[in-house]
Amino acid sequence: MAQKFAPSLMGMDFMNVQEQIEGLNPYAYYYHIDIIDWHYAKNMCVSPQFIGQLRQITDLPLDVHIMVKDMGLDMIEAVIDAGADIVSLPEEELGQNVFKYISYIRERGRKVGIVLGPTATLEDTKYYLDQVDLLTFMGVTPGFAKQKLIEPVLDKIREAHRIREEKGYTFETQIDGGCNR
């Protein structure tokens, strides 16, 4: 499978968003956008309103990674209404709501993404992995750019590819963070 370039907008210069997006559009497959609430990770990033503004300057798909504590359907609805094409949810925040969230995202015609933190396991996803479109592996501790890759994450990615092959699943995989070598 060919590699695809999905730049994260976390480290962009927010004073020059349009110029940067227009420069990346010819090369990007889609954009990765983080919504962080200071509780999930000690950082803050963009809001759903930014997604709506971004939608005005690019037609590329938007993968919105919701990194918030106490996530609910209202947050998922807000990012979909703003223009998200893929809604990526942190596995450790799903709990008993996982099937409700997946169903809602599908009903709204969007793709389902699941994000595995560095310590999460693929075992955690076994009951719903067949319903996932994009499986994201955090290569760093969530919340901050420019960290060093946590090497064992690469083993999890290989394991996911093996499971996908064995079971005939169709999810794509991506790594988020630490891809600087």
Task: Please state what every model-predicted region is.
Residues M1-S88, L94-N97, K111-V112, T125-V132, ...:
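Conserved N-terminal beta1-alpha1 strand-loop-helix module at the mouth
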Residues D37-W38, V140-F144:
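A short, flexible beta-alpha/helix-coil linker loop
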Residues Y101, E107-R110:
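Short acidic, glycine/proline-enriched helix-loop-strand junctions
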Residues V115-T119:
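Short gly/ser/thr-rich secondary-structure transition/capping motifs
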Residues G178-R181:
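Acidic, divalent-metal-coordinating active-site segment for phosphoryl/phosphodiester hydrolysis
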